Each structure stands twice: as structure tokens, then as C-alpha cells.
Amino acid sequence: MRRYLKKAKPKIVQTSDNEEEKHEENLNVSQSNKNANRRKTKAKEKNSGKFRVKYENEEGDDDGEDSQIPLIPKVKKQSSFHSVDDLISRRMDALSHESGYSNAYVDELKRKSRQTPSEFTKKEEDSSTKESELQTRSSPPLPVNTSLEWNMLNQGIPEEAMIKELKDREGRKRNIAMMTDNYISLETGDQLMLAQNHKEEKLLQTEDEIQDEGYSGFENYVEESEKLQEIYHHSSESLRTRSIQMAVDQKNMEMELDDEDIAEPIQSWEHTQIKKGAFGESPAFTNGLSVKLPNILTMDEQIQRLKEAIASEKLQQEERSQIIKSLMEEELEINEQEEKIKHSFIDLDKTLLNNLTKSKS
């Protein structure tokens, strides 16, 4: 029965004194609200550039500083560009002794990094010097004539990888030689082969460099090209090519002088016209051109030529007969050897059969 019993509420009677108290309470509430608003504005001015997070179960800020919401600082956007040193330091922190990575793996990462700090390079230098000293103490001195291939084989490198590495090295050397010993002119685009440059100066010049340097760069380019042309003109290769060309031209001139039997096309045409009688029978044309008659052999000379031809044919026949005889003799020897081999096989078969019969018996 007690659950259903309700407590009696005191009944408040409205009087003039109660109305005055209520008015005073309303004034106090309005003044407290104004003070709270002032605090909020001051907090906003102080915490400009920061944002506030309001939670779901949050109530009003009537209690002042006790009920203030926590302020979170503004998050800056991280730049996409990181320095190499920072990355290395972070990686080294990750690869500490607690991470469980081996020292070899860490050394590989150090070598592969683009820019290593001075601490790691010094350590590597010290370790390399120690290893070299140990190798010199332990290993015997190598002979002077040991080649690169022999050293690679001693290291345990397979032959295929060794051949590939040597080919790559030759290609790299060829490319470096092409860059150092060639000059490409910008006007014609031709490639000039120069003599060996022991100073290893860069002789290749591009249009971009000239345009960047301006007119002074163009003047330097012209002077440099003239110098290079002089070097090429006086180089051993150019002298060799010129001497070969001069010798070929001289030989051609001598051949033209020696070949008097072969008439030029104009002279042959004139000769045919004179034969036809186009120019008449004037002595100026007939005496000016020397007509060459064919060389006709006499009977004795023809007989001598025939005798020489017959003698040469007889000699050739004798040589052929000797070759045929030698071939026939070789064939006979081969046949005899084949017969001997056949007889030996027959004897072997007989001996094997005899041995088998004896073993069975």
C-alpha cells in the first residue's frame, strides 16, 4: 500500500513577497547568461585558428570554465616532398636492434640509399679498410698476369654472368669513347671522328647550351668548331685517308695513260665519220689522226703458239694421270684394310662361339 501513497506537496500561495523574489531570480539568470556569452566571445578571440569538437552528450556552457570543450590544434597538411636524410633516419629507427633485421640487410639499405650521412660512410670506410687488411694478410699475393675473367671465376661467378658483364663493360667503354672522341656539327649534323683526346675533355656541344649562353656561347662554339676542324685536318686518320685517296687518284691517272688502245667515245665517233667521208679527203684531218691497225701474226708465230699450247695440254694430262693413279692406289689400300677388318670380325665370332660351347659343356 505504501507504493501507491503519494507525498503531499506544499501548496504555494501567490503573494506580493513571492513575486518580488521571482523577479530577482530572473534578473540574476539574465546577468549570468550575459557573462557566459562574454566568456565565449573571449575564448573565440583567443583560440582563433582552432576548431572545437562538440560531443553528442554535451550540455550547455552554463557552468563556465568547468564545462569548457577541449580545443584541438589545427592540423597542417604534410608536404609530399621529404628530404633523403629524414627518410634514412626514419628507416634506421625502424631497423633498430629491436626490429630483428640482420646487419647485412641494413648495410644493403645503406648502400642503396641515394645520399648517406657521414656517419655511415665513415663506418663503411673503416670496415672496408679492415676487410682489405685481413684479405692481404690471409690470402697469398695474386700473380701479375691474372686476368679479369680468372678473378671472376675465383669469386664463384658463373660463366654466363661473367660474359654478360664483360659485354656490358665493353659497351659502356664504347659509349664513353663515342661521347669523348666525336664532334657533331650543328649546321650539317655530320659526325666527325677525332683523334684520341688524352685530356678527356667534353667535345660534344648541343644547341641548348648555345642558346642558354647567348651570342657569346655561339662565338665560343664557332671558335671551338674551327679548332676541332684543324685538329681533324692534321690528325693521323685524316692524313691516312688523304694519302690513300691521292694514291688511288694517281693510279687511276696512270691506268688512263697506259690504256691507249681503248679510244675515247669522241675520238671513235670522229674516226667513224672520217671513214665514211663526212669531212672530205682533206689532209688536215687524215694526217692528224693516227689509225692503228691490228697486230697480225705470221705463220711461224702461229705455229710456235700451237706448239706451246699442245705442250701445256700434255703436261696437264700427265698431271691428271698421276692424280688418278694415286687415287686408285688409295682405293686399293682401303679395300685391303676393309678385308682385314672383315677377317678379324669373323675370327672374333669364331672365338666367341668356341668359348660359349666350352662354358656350356
Curated annotation (Swiss-Prot):
GO BP annotation list: spliceosomal complex disassembly
Location of region: Disordered: 1-82, 94-147
Comp. bias (Basic and acidic residues): 44-57, 120-134
Residues passing through the membrane, by range: none
InterPro entries tied to this protein: Ntr2
Comp. bias regions, Polar residues: 135-147
Protein's UniProt name: Uncharacterized protein C17A2.08c
Organism of origin: Schizosaccharomyces pombe (strain 972 / ATCC 24843)
